[in-house]
């Protein structure tokens, strides 16, 4: 189901949601952190989704053990490097790694700006080693409040040339996008792109708000757009992309099952939607699974899957020249 003549992308992939269980075990031992289990087999139920979670917040708790072992900036650098290695193993040509440095820093009071620098270093080294192209998207974790988001923003701005876009994720119900208008104004002033998690836990109004108030060029998840025909029309007309994450939306109980997922409808409506993983380490999936298992189960035809793959590159925060070069590189292989 993957067209090998086209670039394979994953543009909604959380770096801090893709920490290998084996790495969690090793870092736990290295830093004498008490884990809920002492073997890989018994640890996995604590760090991966085994059965669908009742809601998004419950799903997010599965990420916590991964960041609890980030006891140093070297640990942050390691997981960033391993994210690129994992992308290469999956056959990805281009990834956009979203990460929340405040969340990664929290357990051991690491300097937030230092985490950003460590992630940049690890990703850069990974790209050099494995030949994958990657860009970094800074996440403000609204779950932790406006002040914490401000701290994350300042850390990103200190490395503005290595950050491609700003994202907003976390508890959308408790912390609506309206609290973060000034943050996104500064992001635009820095020349960054804007993508926002919306229409996942909250309804279609959260997507409208992300577009109108925060200036979103893309929407993360966006499943609730299906409830608003005018919104779907607007997304199609304005070519505002939806970063679809099929398995994730089932595991968070945002959508009942893959057959009910709106991605097929979005594509039929002319919306620029792509296939992505979200938190592959926590979900126990990879991009190959999303294309070959999840997408057909969601009712997508072979041609629709190919269109979603094309959309992934079209939506990517790359220049026209970078996209052309990537297409030519893949076609030449």
From Swiss-Prot:
Entries under PROSITE patterns matching the protein: A_DEAMINASE
Cofactor: Zn(2+)
Residues involved in substrate binding: 14, 16, 170, 279
Keywords for this protein: Hydrolase, Metal-binding, Nucleotide metabolism, Zinc
Binding site for Zn(2+): 12, 14, 197, 278
Catalytic activity, as annotated: adenosine + H2O + H(+) = inosine + NH4(+); 2'-deoxyadenosine + H2O + H(+) = 2'-deoxyinosine + NH4(+)
Cofactor info, note text: Binds 1 zinc ion per subunit.
Keyword Cell cycle assigned: no
Active-site residues, record numbering mapped to chain: 200 (proton donor)
GO cellular component, one term: cytosol
Site annotation Important for catalytic activity: residues: 221
Statement: the UniProt record of this protein carries the keyword tRNA-binding: no
GO molecular function: 2'-deoxyadenosine deaminase activity; adenosine deaminase activity; zinc ion binding
UniProt-listed GO biological process terms: adenosine catabolic process; hypoxanthine salvage; inosine biosynthetic process; nucleotide metabolic process; purine ribonucleoside monophosphate biosynthetic process
EC numbers for this chain: 3.5.4.4
Major enzyme class: hydrolase
Family that this chain belongs to: Belongs to the metallo-dependent hydrolases superfamily. Adenosine and AMP deaminases family. Adenosine deaminase subfamily.
The protein's role, per its UniProt record: Catalyzes the hydrolytic deamination of adenosine and 2-deoxyadenosine.
UniProt-listed HAMAP family: A_deaminase
Protein name: Adenosine deaminase
